Amino acid sequence: MISLSFITFLSIIYASCLLGTFCYKKFAIKYNIVSNINYRTLHEEPTPRGGGLVFGFVFILSIFFLYFQQHISHDLMLVFGVGSCFAGLIGYIDDIVSISPFKKLIFQFLLAFWVLTIFRVDLVGYSSLLNSWQYFLVASFLLVWLINAYNFIDGIDGMAISAAILIISTLVLTIYIVDDSRNSIELMLILLVLLASCIGFLFFNWPTASIFMGDSGSIFLGYCFGALIVYSTINDKISFFTWLIVFGYYLSDTTITTLIRIIIVKKWYGTHRSHAYQNLARVLKNHSIVTNGVIIYHLLWLL
C-alpha cells in the first residue's frame, strides 16, 4: 500500500511542518503572539502560541492534494479539508483575541453538525430509546466534548502533540494488524498524513517547548479525532470501544477532572490547571518527566 512516492509525500509534509513552524515562531515573536506568564500557566517565560496553525494548514493542503489526486472521497475532503480548516481558524482566532466560551461552544456544535451531516449518520435503529434527532444531539454533544477534552490535554509541554502521535500510531498499527489495510486505504491515508504533520511539530513543542500549539492546534486535533471516530465507526473500520481504549488516560483525566470541577467549583468551565498531569508538573517542576511518564503509562495501558 505504501509506495516510495507516498513516503516522499509524507516526508514533504514533515519537512513543511518543521520549516513552517520555524518561520511562524519568528512571526509570533515579532507580533507578540505569545502566552504570557500568569497564575494559570505552568511555563516560566513568555512563549509563542498558535503553532497549531502550521501543522493544521499543512494537513489541510495535503487533504486537498489527496482529493484532487482522487485518493479520498468528496465527503472526506469536506470533513477533513473544509471542516478542519474552520476548526483551526476558530482556534487561531481564540489564540489571538480570546473568544468567549459561549461563542466557542456554538462554533464547536456547528462543527459537530457538519461532520454528522456530511457523513449522513443514520442514527435511527441504534436503539429504541431515542429518536433520530435526539441521537443527533447526543452524538453532537459527544463530539463537542471530545474537542474540548483534547483542548484540556494541551496543558504542559509536549502533552497534546505526543498524545496525538501515540493515538494515531496505535490506530495505524491496529488497522495494519487486525484489518486488511487495503479495505481502509482512505482512513490510513488520512491517519498517516496527520501523523506526519504532528511529528513535524513535535520537535518544537517537546519540553522545554519553544512554541505552543494553542487552541488552533488542540481544537483542530480534537475535531479531526472526532471526525475520524464517526467515519471509522459508521463504516466498521474501527469500533467505538477501540477508540475509548486508545484514548485511555487522556480522556479519563480530562473527563474525571471536569466532573469534579462541576461538583465543587462554581465557574467550572473557566481556564485552570487542575488536571492530574498538571499537578504533577507543578510539583515536580519538570514537564519532560510528566510527559514521558504519561507516554509510558499509556503504552503499558495499550499492552
Regions found by a protein language model. Name each.
Residues 22-48, 256-288:
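Cytosolic, membrane-interface loops and tails of multi-pass inner-membrane proteins
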Residues 193-197, 286-303:
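Hydrophobic membrane-spanning alpha-helices of multi-pass integral membrane proteins
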Residues 2-252:
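"…together with the soluble PPM/PP2C metallo-phosphatase catalytic core" -> "…together
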